[in-house]
């Protein structure tokens, strides 16, 4: 592990970045300055650090994952080939212990301190490839359109409770809006398929994932997005934890013996897609169907068995990616 001499904590907001610099040999001293959350502002951070004669190759930048507001900083630090660490906000919050009040300067300092104290947990971050960034944005827009379609679709429920003259006022406008949204939805899905098709590596991954029973087109795309093209996770167990399907023990001393259960801190979209995939798999995959029925007959709860199937789907997906060969159902060859 690299021995860093300087730690930079950055609190990100929409318009500005609060930057706090801590030196490894004098952690009781810190410097604070503010820049705009733009490419120009981020480059000024680099300039100010250089003016202070700071070795950027021995500097670790640390900041919270704030979604789209994080992109400019991640992109610029990647271009300068500098080390940075993106940490979940809840992890930093819980590491602070009891605290009273907050402001951006204090938050930036807490982030810098987190990187100093938890250097043994360091896992350097990297920006996803351009195609995966595009897929993520398109997938998010598709989700918005799907939710909007659902909202506008409920308007027809009013038809049975009001007169035709009254309903006609909104029905025509509603129909035009729904038609427009469906066109937008089709365009988004077409563009996503086009991006997959034009990238040989993503196309191969997509086809391999689709070969697994229970995994549809949208699930396959989200697997690629969530794993950053299967570069963000080393194995299926880590991804199962990320997806909220890995079981954990809950016990303490001799009296607390909670059941083994999953944790709610997870990618809820991935978990939802896996749930739908598990329900489809027990209908169309004879092996998983038999497994589900067997466990149910043993008295296991439905959700427990379905969660096991979600984990099996993840294992299968990672297996086909690692082998680079499609999933083959050997169950039908068993005697």
Mark where each language-model region is.
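Low-complexity, acidic/Ser/Thr- and charged residue-rich accessory regions of DNA metabolism proteins
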Residues: 254-255, 292-335
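Nucleic-acid-processing active sites and adjacent nucleic-acid-binding tracks
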Residues: 26-60
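Gly/Thr-rich phosphate-binding beta-strand-loop-beta motif of the actin/hexokinase/Hsp70
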Residues: 2-23, 111
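Phosphate-backbone recognition surface of nucleic-acid-processing proteins
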Residues: 207, 211, 217, 221-298, ...
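Short, solvent-exposed helix-loop connector elements
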Residues: 52, 123-137, 163-166, 258-261, ...
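Long, charge-rich intrinsically disordered scaffolds of nucleic-acid metabolism proteins
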Residues: 75, 85, 89-208
């Amino acid at each position: 592990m690299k021995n860093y001499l300087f730690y930079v904590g950055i609190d990100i907001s929409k318009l500005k970045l609060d930057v706090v610099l801590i030196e490894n040999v004098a952690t009781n001293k810190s410097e604070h300055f503010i820049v705009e959350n733009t490419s120009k502002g981020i480059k000024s951070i680099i300039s100010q650090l250089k003016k202070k004669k700071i070795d950027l190759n021995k500097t670790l930048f640390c900041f919270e994952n704030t979604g789209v507001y994080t992109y400019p900083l991640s992109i610029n630090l990647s271009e300068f080939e500098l080390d940075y660490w993106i940490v979940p906000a809840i992890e930093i919050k819980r590491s602070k212990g009891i605290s009273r009040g907050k402001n951006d300067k204090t938050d930036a300092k807490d982030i810098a301190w987190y990187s100093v104290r938890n250097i043994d947990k360091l896992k350097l971050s990297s920006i996803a490839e351009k195609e995966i960034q595009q897929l993520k944005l398109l997938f998010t827009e598709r989700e918005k359109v799907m939710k909007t379609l659902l909202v506008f679709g409920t308007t027809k429920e009013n038809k049975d409770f009001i007169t035709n003259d009254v309903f006609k006022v909104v029905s025509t406008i509603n129909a035009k809006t729904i038609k427009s949204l469906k066109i937008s939805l089709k365009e988004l899905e077409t563009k996503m398929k086009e991006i997959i098709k034009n990238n040989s590596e993503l196309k191969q991954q997509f086809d391999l994932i689709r070969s697994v029973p229970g995994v549809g087109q949208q699930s396959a795309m989200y697997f690629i997005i969530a794993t950053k093209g299967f570069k963000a996770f080393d194995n299926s167990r880590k991804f199962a934890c990320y997806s909220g399907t890995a079981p954990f023990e809950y016990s303490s001393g001799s009296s607390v013996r909670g059941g083994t259960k999953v944790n709610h801190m997870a990618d809820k979209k991935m978990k939802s897609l896996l749930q739908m995939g598990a329900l489809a798999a027990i209908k169309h995959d004879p092996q998983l169907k038999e497994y589900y029925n067997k466990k149910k007959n043993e008295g296991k709860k439905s959700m427990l068995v379905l969660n096991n199937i979600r984990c099996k789907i993840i294992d299968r997906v990672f297996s086909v990616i690692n082998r680079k060969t499609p999933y083959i159902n050997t169950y039908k060859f068993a005697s």
